[in-house]
């Protein structure tokens, strides 16, 4: 077959042309080094590798766009570090002295706010300052950050300052809104140009981030700020335990408690927000998912950074915008789960089934179960969960979703679900996966379901011997070995011991065989074991509940309280045991002779108790000063006679007036010229 006619020596000619461009090797070396310095982009550096490379009509990536706000000098760093230490110690004599100090730090930081926020060593000072600032200082700092939020929220240290600023500014938005409405009612004129409202500052900050939501959604640091902004605009609680883990990680430090400032209680409750926030929230939520297709949205469900944002978007959509929003085909729930019937091996059914076993996606599924409309939840439970709830409860990850499902079941569905889970109780107990069992007990108490079969399953799993049962449930043998060893981690507890303690506390809240399982075990152990339980920071809660809950019978309290004779002073001086001593006060409400015996033990060790912080608390809670001075009054309190005349002097006014009282009243009436009292 004839070949194509080709020109000989073409490779050599191409090589000569390349060599003619730069003949000096030093120039080539210098040019390469400058290129690497100017464009630190690996794909752009590869332009020098191949001579036949045809570049596209695009510019290399520019990494010089991120602004640099400068560095603090050594003197400034020392000053701000010293100020941070003083704020953390919080040893100011008066609040006025503290406010003067904070204002001076603000004056020193004037013009350096962005440097401090981006500083690794001084950004913590900025957070502490914000936590202790007044509303005017927060506004001033907020105004300094305006125009830089897009860069600050992506910064490792400045992003924490932005979050702290948003949290503390949010608590003043509602108060400003109330003041504004009251001034409008009084028709008072106000110079609106003097100072921007926090409402306007928030809207300006959000406008800076617009157009970048898709990237910030999965950005390592900015995603935390997006979650917080969603809560602020929706007026949802910012310090609620259910939302704290979604906003920030568990390693997030609470600097407000160290500075000694108290947040407004409204920050932990649902807040009223301006109407402009509702409009901004709808636009923000729409823009966040506008450029994302359904496939990418489902990929976010298992993304470790994007998943928490998706959780909040779903929660706000379903709770803040109403359940009817779920019917909208453009809603986030319908984009994730477009199929209405969830039948067969459809795309939506496969997606939801996959979330059960995913450590990240299961959290999104918990949010769907909690906030989804009732019609959707019933269909979801009937088709995907009801027949498989036993196998789901076996899995460590899917078990958390099962707990959320149990919280929404009716009485009949809960009874059938318990029947499906009962065969799995023994394996769950063996692996110390007790969250599903605990949820079954708690929901059974609420719904009024008979928990006798569950008690029988737990008895079979833990054994008939009462001592070994409580040892296995609370992991007492392991804690005793740790206390006897040389390790110093006595205050740490294993997750198995914590889950066992929570299960025992849930069992004690149920009347009948469940509480009797724990009570009989506590009576069967030795006194030394009982004292060790009382002194354990985790397990002692079981003993406190056993003494104080309404399920505690008089017979049980009479038997268990007598075991503490001679040990009251020892427990009162212990950080955990002192709470058990406090619980013994209501536990002996109908056992006055036992309570007096315990009080005598406390009197004997009065000096040691007064020298101890926890001992002084026990002395005060047991009213021991009254016991020493007025024994009769103390006995009246011990019997529960708080309304007696010996304790409450105001009770005399409710008694019939004596003759001398009537005479005094008549004399006073004559002096005042009024009628005689009848």
Swiss-Prot record:
The keyword Protein biosynthesis does not apply. One of its GO terms (cellular component) is preribosome, small subunit precursor. The keyword Nucleus applies. Its main location: nucleus. Residues 1-15 have a biased composition (Basic residues). Residues 1-24, 477-496 are annotated as: Disordered. GO terms for biological process: endonucleolytic cleavage in 5'-ETS of tricistronic rRNA transcript (SSU-rRNA, 5.8S rRNA, LSU-rRNA); endonucleolytic cleavage in ITS1 to separate SSU-rRNA from 5.8S rRNA and LSU-rRNA from tricistronic rRNA transcript (SSU-rRNA, 5.8S rRNA, LSU-rRNA); endonucleolytic cleavage to generate mature 5'-end of SSU-rRNA from (SSU-rRNA, 5.8S rRNA, LSU-rRNA); ribosomal small subunit export from nucleus. Belongs to the NOP9 family. RNA-binding nucleolar protein required for pre-rRNA processing. Involved in production of 18S rRNA and assembly of small ribosomal subunit. PANTHER family: NUCLEOLAR PROTEIN 9. This is Nucleolar protein 9. It comes from Paracoccidioides brasiliensis (strain Pb03). The gene is NOP9.
